[in-house]
Each structure stands twice: as C-alpha cells, then as structure tokens.
C-alpha cells in the first residue's frame, strides 16, 4: 500500500488546531482533558474517525494532503468533539444534540456531519450490476462475495436479483 507522507508543517498545523480546540474545552469544563493520539491511518472516503476508548483520532492522509487547511479546520474539531462528548456524556448518538452543542458552543465551529471534499482519489472501484429496472454499482467487497457465491443482492425497487453486467470496474 502506498502511504502518503504528511509534511511536518502539516502535522504541526493539525496539532496546533487540536490543542487550540482542546484548550477551549478545558476552559469550558474546567477539566484537564488529555491530548488524543493522532494517527494518519484512515482509509477510504471517511475524512476521520474518533476511537472513543483508545482516545485517538485517525485522519485520512490523502484527504488531508489534498485539502490541507479546510480539512484541519473542519475534520480535527469534528473528531475531537466525538471524544469530548463521549468523555462528558457517555454513549450518545454520534451526531446528536450533545455533539452539535460541543461543536458550536464549546469548540466554536459549525456542526457539519459530513465533509464536502473531492473524493475521486480515494473512492473505491465499483462493479456494474443489473436488475429488471436499473443499473447498480456494487463495491469490490460485495462483488467478490457474489463471485465466490457467498452473497446475492436484490434491487430494493423491483426485487430482482442483481446480475453482474460487465467485466470492467468503474
């Protein structure tokens, strides 16, 4: 696998944002939250994930390199908010009222559930399948399950079994 190398200046910008937002939370709650570990291991189209028990944030290195400051301004506080909400409120819905409040009132960032970054460079290939009414795109994982005879998929509209349409992934 080709790993994206994150320039030290970009890693420092990530940490600067993390520490600024963490300081806002510390001041607001009068609690000394530990600094979460940052890993650049997130794959696929997700910009980042918060690992609650491990107290770590995993960031997508490709999307970070392609979007830099907008990524830092949006994704780092988003994932930090998940950790802080877990620490303060326990298990609650991931983008619920507590998370929204943490983003807007404590971290002073607008609460957005999803990123709007271009994902062409990190998007998986898909395979075309047909039913009676339309063309579907199955992921590599689902396609392989069909090929091995482990799964079959049906159209939600017409109910027909999906059939592999062509040899080339899209």
Curated annotation (Swiss-Prot):
- What are the transmembrane regions? none
Q: Which UniProt key words apply to this protein?
A: Cytoplasm, Metal-binding, Zinc
Q: What is this protein called?
A: Protein SprT
Q: Bound how, and how many: what does the cofactor note say?
A: Binds 1 zinc ion.
Q: Which residues form the active site?
A: 79
Query: Could you mention a single GO BP entry for this protein?
Result: response to stress
> From what superkingdom does this record's organism come?
Bacteria
Domain SprT-like intervals: 23-164
Instruction: Name the PANTHER family on file.
Output: PROTEIN SPRT
Protein species of origin = Serratia proteamaculans (strain 568)
Question: Source taxonomy lineage?
Answer: Bacteria, Pseudomonadati, Pseudomonadota, Gammaproteobacteria, Enterobacterales
Keyword Cytoplasm part of the UniProt annotation: yes
Protein location: Cytoplasm
UniProt cofactor(s): Zn(2+)
Residues that bind Zn(2+): 78, 82
Family per UniProt? Answer: Belongs to the SprT family.
Protein's UniProt keywords contain Nucleus: no
HAMAP family assigned to the protein according to its UniProt record, in alphabetical order: SprT (MF_00746)
Q: List, alphabetically, the GO terms of the cellular component aspect.
A: cytoplasm
Mention one GO molecular function. zinc ion binding
Q: Which Pfam families match?
A: SprT-like, Zn_ribbon_SprT
């Amino acid at each position: 696998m080709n790993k994206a190398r994150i320039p030290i200046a970009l890693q420092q910008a990530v940490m600067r944002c993390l520490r600024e937002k963490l300081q806002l939370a510390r001041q607001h709650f009068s609690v000394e939250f530990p600094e979460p570990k940052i890993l650049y291991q997130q794959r696929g189209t997700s910009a980042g994930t918060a690992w609650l028990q491990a107290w770590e944030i995993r960031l997508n290195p490709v999307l970070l390199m392609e979007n830099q400051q907008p990524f830092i301004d949006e994704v780092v506080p988003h994932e930090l908010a998940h950790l802080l909400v877990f620490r303060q409120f326990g298990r609650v819905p991931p983008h619920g009222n507590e998370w929204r409040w943490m983003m807007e009132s404590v971290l002073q960032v607008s609460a957005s559930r999803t990123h709007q970054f271009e994902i062409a460079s990190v998007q998986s290939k898909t395979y075309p399948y047909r039913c009676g009414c339309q063309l579907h795109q199955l992921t590599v994982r689902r396609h392989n399950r069909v090929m091995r005879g482990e799964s079959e998929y049906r159209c939600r509209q017409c109910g027909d079994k999906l059939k592999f349409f062509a040899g080339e992934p899209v």
